[in-house]
Design a protein with these regions (language model features):
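Rossmann-like dinucleotide/phosphate-binding beta-alpha-beta segment
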Residues: 137-226
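Glycine-rich nucleotide-phosphate-binding loops and adjacent flexible coil segments
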Residues: 231
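Rossmann-like dinucleotide-binding domain for NAD(H)/NADP(H)
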Residues: 227, 236-331
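An N-terminal-biased, well-structured beta-alpha scaffold segment characteristic
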Residues: 1-97, 217
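Short glycine-/small-residue-rich Rossmann-like dinucleotide-binding loops
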Residues: 54-55, 200, 206-208, 234-235, ...
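Structural alpha-helical scaffold elements that stabilize or flank donor/cofactor-binding regions
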Residues: 42-43, 194-195, 220, 284-285
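Phosphate-binding beta-alpha-beta segment of Rossmann-like dinucleotide-binding domains, i.e.
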Residues: 92-148, 160-163, 167, 175
Length: 331
């Protein structure tokens, strides 16, 4: 089975090359630095499958071009699949497989790191000390111990975040359509309105769907406690950015930590340090002293990358052998 990898970085080579050389997987890999889109889809000619990341264009026109060059399988080396037109994939005869849970702890740990960095002004403190300024002005934060955390979405990542918050000595509230029995004794499930009104730290861990888009908006922000901490390591579209910026200007939040944000496509994972940034969202958000923005890196640990590689190759092997596809995504 020949797999064409799109949007690859050096670390992809490091973790996938070893597995590709293993006869157990029986795969040949061709790495492309170009990301998957309508222009690059024809480069998959001669392959059986393509492998793409969360920032790839997997819309209907792209999938149609992949099908035209003989691609039968789309391997997502990520958990999210809201960038994939599943109906078009089915119509084109392309099987979609994903990595449902590579290291939930990695993302949850980053979420707590963002919460603390924003709350305790770690970035500002670092810059001050670098400039030999050891004054404490502007660095006042809040205790997490004894406060309440609100976890929106209690899948694997949300559950990991709940356990972290519990370990910090926080009262943990949770909202999800489905209760996670593994969290019995750790969280108390409540309605979203109660969570927003009660929690001192709100962390988003739900998928981006029609129902969850802008789950954080003008109205839900008004429900939140003043000086709450808001963290998003899930999908940028969960937060209405304009509403968030207005709330920050009104000094609503003690801190905001974002690993994702709206309209990050075309910018995420790229280096624009020598360019003029065209996206206005990040500069505005970074102008607030209590906001910390990172580059969609919550997943980015050695443990997670190894797990992603193994599961992706196992998905490819199962497809090639006609075995049960436990990680298939259907429309």
């Amino acid at each position: 089975m020949k797999i064409i990898f799109y949007g690859t970085r050096e670390y992809d080579h490091y973790y996938f090359d070893v597995l590709a050389a293993d006869p157990e997987y029986g795969c040949e890999i061709r790495f492309l630095t170009a990301n998957l889109d309508a222009d690059t889809a024809p480069l998959a000619q001669g392959g059986d499958a393509v492998c793409a990341f969360v920032n790839a264009d997997c819309s209907a026109p792209v999938l149609e071009k992949l099908a035209q060059v003989g691609i039968r399988c789309l391997l997502l080396r990520c958990a999210g699949y809201n960038n994939v037109d599943l109906a078009a994939a089915q119509k084109c005869g392309i099987t979609v497989l994903r990595v449902p849970g590579y290291s939930p702890e990695a993302v949850a740990e980053h979420a707590m790191a963002l919460a603390q960095a924003a709350n305790r002004r770690i970035c500002k403190a670092y810059i001050k000390v670098r400039n030999n300024n050891f004054a404490l002005d502007g660095l006042l934060g809040y205790n997490l111990y004894g406060s309440s955390a609100g976890i929106v979405g209690t899948g694997r990542i949300g559950a990991a975040m709940a356990r972290i918050c519990h370990g910090f000595g926080m009262t943990v509230l949770a909202y999800d359509q489905y209760r996670n029995p593994a969290l019995d004794g750790i969280v108390r499930y409540v309605e979203l309105d109660e969570l927003l009104r009660t929690a001192d730290l709100i962390s988003l861990h739900c998928p981006l769907t029609v129902e969850t888009r802008h789950i954080i908006n003008v109205d839900t922000i008004k429900m939140m406690r003043d000086n709450a901490i808001l963290v998003n390591t899930s999908r940028g579209g969960l937060i209405d950015t304009d509403a968030l910026i207005d709330a920050l200007r009104a000094r609503k939040f003690a801190g905001v930590g974002l690993d994702v944000y709206e309209d990050e496509d075309g910018q995420v994972f790229e280096d624009f340090s020598d360019d003029v940034l065209q996206n206005e969202v990040v500069p505005i958000l970074m102008s607030f002293p209590n906001v910390v923005v990172t580059s969609h890196q919550a997943f980015f640990t050695r443990t997670a990358l190894q797990s992603i590689a193994i599961t992706t190759m196992e998905n490819a092997r199962a497809f090639a052998r006609g075995e049960k596809l436990v990680n298939e995504v259907k429309g």
